[in-house]
Amino acid sequence: MFGNGFSSSPNKTIKNQSGSKFPTLTLWDNINCQHKLITEKFKIKKIALVTGWSMAGCQSYQWASQYPNMVKAILPFCASSKTSIHNHVFLEGVKAALTADKNWNNGNYKRQPVAGLRAFGRVYAGWAFSQNFYREKMFKKLGYKNSEELLNDWAEDHAKNWDANNLLSKLKTWQLNDISRGPTYNNNYIKALKSIKAKTILMPCNQDLYLSLIHI
């Protein structure tokens, strides 16, 4: 996926598109390129199943609507076919936490805004799990003694493993998630949904605050 630090991303691209100059990309762009790869390089004509979690799950919806005659089945879990307003607002919050770092410099930083990345991780942890998750201390099943250990782990994970511009590039793609976005359906969401021919199993998440049953 573009922006993830492995494919073309703000920290891994040509100079005039690097860092804060990296273009905004949608899931339509991602799936269009994935389609070119598997059809032109690997000569694949049909896909038996597209599945994934979170943004990968969003891409499974996108595949099914963008190429309805190619995809036989999808199984997105903890994902949505269109990012909700609530989800969008949550992402604005974690983005604000990151960009408040004095080293952010509008994305033109000389060193990673580590304090902002840590803040991003700590704020995100409050959304990635539900009230019940914390009330029932389910974090102990993940190996954490208490909630502070979980918060610290999330903070350090983001500080050590993410480039800030990469992270915000993915967030922008997530916020723009809408299977009707692009030249095929021109923002007609209902038409895009009706175009899906793939057999579908939808798996919501019971333990987060933004991809529960009502959001998928």
Region spans (language model):
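Active-site nucleophile elbow and catalytic-triad environment of alpha/beta-hydrolase enzymes
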Residues: 169-192
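Short, proline-enriched alpha-helix->beta-strand connector loops that line the catalytic pocket
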Residues: 195-200
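Short beta-strand/loop motif that positions the catalytic acidic residue
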Residues: 202-204
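Short alpha-helical scaffolding segments that buttress acidic/His motifs in well-ordered protein cores
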Residues: 124, 128, 167-174
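Conserved small/polar residues in nucleotide/adenosyl-binding loops
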Residues: 214-216
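Acidic catalytic loop of the alpha/beta-hydrolase fold
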Residues: 207-211
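Gly/Pro-rich cap/lid or specificity-loop segments adjacent to the active site
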Residues: 1-58, 65, 69-82, 86-91
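Alpha/beta-hydrolase-fold enzymes
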Residues: 70-71, 75-157
